[in-house]
Amino acid sequence: MKQLFYYLTLLTGLLLVFIGARFLLLPMPAETAFGIHTATGGDYSFHYIKGIRDLFTGVIIVILLLAREFRAAGFLLLAGSIIPMVDFSIVMSHADYETARLYPHAIAVVLCLILGFHYIRTTAKS
Protein backbone atom coordinates (compact mmCIF):
# COMPACT_ATOMS: atom_id res chain seq x y z
CA MET A 1 0.00 0.00 0.00
CA LYS A 2 2.90 2.32 0.81
CA GLN A 3 4.25 1.94 -2.73
CA LEU A 4 0.84 2.71 -4.21
CA PHE A 5 0.65 6.03 -2.35
CA TYR A 6 4.25 6.82 -3.30
CA TYR A 7 3.65 6.22 -7.01
CA LEU A 8 0.30 8.04 -7.00
CA THR A 9 2.04 11.04 -5.47
CA LEU A 10 4.91 10.82 -7.96
CA LEU A 11 2.44 10.57 -10.84
CA THR A 12 0.53 13.57 -9.47
CA GLY A 13 3.70 15.66 -9.30
CA LEU A 14 4.85 14.64 -12.77
CA LEU A 15 1.42 15.31 -14.27
CA LEU A 16 1.46 18.79 -12.74
CA VAL A 17 4.89 19.41 -14.28
CA PHE A 18 3.48 18.31 -17.66
CA ILE A 19 0.32 20.43 -17.30
CA GLY A 20 2.34 23.46 -16.24
CA ALA A 21 4.81 23.09 -19.09
CA ARG A 22 1.94 22.68 -21.56
CA PHE A 23 0.31 25.91 -20.35
CA LEU A 24 3.62 27.71 -20.81
CA LEU A 25 4.48 26.21 -24.21
CA LEU A 26 1.07 25.43 -25.79
CA PRO A 27 -1.40 27.74 -24.05
CA MET A 28 -4.48 27.23 -26.22
CA PRO A 29 -4.55 23.40 -26.25
CA ALA A 30 -3.86 23.48 -22.50
CA GLU A 31 -6.77 25.85 -21.97
CA THR A 32 -9.12 23.53 -23.84
CA ALA A 33 -7.99 20.56 -21.75
CA PHE A 34 -8.47 22.63 -18.59
CA GLY A 35 -12.12 23.05 -19.48
CA ILE A 36 -12.67 26.68 -20.42
CA HIS A 37 -12.23 28.94 -23.39
CA THR A 38 -11.29 32.59 -22.99
CA ALA A 39 -10.95 35.24 -25.63
CA THR A 40 -7.32 36.14 -25.12
CA GLY A 41 -6.69 38.44 -28.04
CA GLY A 42 -3.17 37.02 -28.04
CA ASP A 43 -2.61 37.79 -24.34
CA TYR A 44 -1.72 34.54 -22.61
CA SER A 45 -1.12 35.99 -19.14
CA PHE A 46 -3.69 33.67 -17.52
CA HIS A 47 -2.06 30.69 -19.19
CA TYR A 48 1.41 31.63 -18.01
CA ILE A 49 0.21 32.23 -14.45
CA LYS A 50 -1.50 28.83 -14.39
CA GLY A 51 1.47 27.20 -16.08
CA ILE A 52 4.06 28.38 -13.60
CA ARG A 53 1.73 27.60 -10.67
CA ASP A 54 1.28 24.00 -11.80
CA LEU A 55 4.91 23.54 -12.83
CA PHE A 56 6.16 24.82 -9.46
CA THR A 57 3.67 22.74 -7.48
CA GLY A 58 4.59 19.59 -9.39
CA VAL A 59 8.32 20.17 -8.93
CA ILE A 60 7.88 20.73 -5.17
CA ILE A 61 5.80 17.55 -4.82
CA VAL A 62 8.45 15.51 -6.65
CA ILE A 63 11.30 17.08 -4.64
CA LEU A 64 9.59 16.40 -1.30
CA LEU A 65 8.84 12.85 -2.36
CA LEU A 66 12.38 12.11 -3.55
CA ALA A 67 13.80 13.73 -0.40
CA ARG A 68 11.52 11.42 1.61
CA GLU A 69 9.90 14.42 3.30
CA PHE A 70 6.56 12.64 3.42
CA ARG A 71 5.03 14.68 6.24
CA ALA A 72 5.83 17.95 4.45
CA ALA A 73 4.41 16.46 1.24
CA GLY A 74 1.26 15.57 3.15
CA PHE A 75 0.76 19.11 4.39
CA LEU A 76 1.51 20.49 0.92
CA LEU A 77 -1.05 18.16 -0.67
CA LEU A 78 -3.71 19.02 1.92
CA ALA A 79 -3.16 22.75 1.61
CA GLY A 80 -2.81 22.45 -2.15
CA SER A 81 -6.19 20.73 -2.46
CA ILE A 82 -7.67 24.21 -2.58
CA ILE A 83 -6.17 24.67 -6.07
CA PRO A 84 -8.17 21.93 -7.84
CA MET A 85 -11.23 22.90 -5.76
CA VAL A 86 -11.06 26.43 -7.14
CA ASP A 87 -10.21 25.15 -10.63
CA PHE A 88 -13.31 22.93 -10.46
CA SER A 89 -15.51 25.87 -9.50
CA ILE A 90 -14.00 28.06 -12.24
CA VAL A 91 -14.74 25.45 -14.90
CA MET A 92 -18.23 24.81 -13.51
CA SER A 93 -19.07 28.52 -13.47
CA HIS A 94 -18.10 28.87 -17.13
CA ALA A 95 -21.27 29.13 -19.22
CA ASP A 96 -20.40 26.43 -21.74
CA TYR A 97 -18.50 23.95 -19.58
CA GLU A 98 -18.48 20.25 -20.41
CA THR A 99 -19.07 17.86 -17.53
CA ALA A 100 -16.16 15.69 -18.65
CA ARG A 101 -13.80 18.64 -18.04
CA LEU A 102 -14.78 18.64 -14.34
CA TYR A 103 -13.57 15.09 -13.67
CA PRO A 104 -9.80 15.76 -13.65
CA HIS A 105 -10.29 18.58 -11.13
CA ALA A 106 -12.54 16.44 -8.91
CA ILE A 107 -10.07 13.54 -9.06
CA ALA A 108 -7.24 15.93 -8.14
CA VAL A 109 -9.16 17.11 -5.05
CA VAL A 110 -9.76 13.53 -3.93
CA LEU A 111 -6.13 12.55 -4.58
CA CYS A 112 -4.76 15.55 -2.69
CA LEU A 113 -6.96 14.85 0.32
CA ILE A 114 -6.34 11.09 0.44
CA LEU A 115 -2.59 11.33 -0.18
CA GLY A 116 -2.18 14.29 2.16
CA PHE A 117 -4.02 12.62 5.04
CA HIS A 118 -2.11 9.38 4.41
CA TYR A 119 1.31 11.02 4.69
CA ILE A 120 0.39 13.02 7.77
CA ARG A 121 -1.16 10.00 9.47
CA THR A 122 1.72 7.62 8.68
CA THR A 123 4.68 9.87 9.47
CA ALA A 124 5.84 10.83 12.91
CA LYS A 125 6.44 14.39 13.97
CA SER A 126 10.12 15.29 13.93
List the model feature ranges, each with a label.
Residues 110-126:
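Membrane-water interface at the C-terminal end of transmembrane alpha helices
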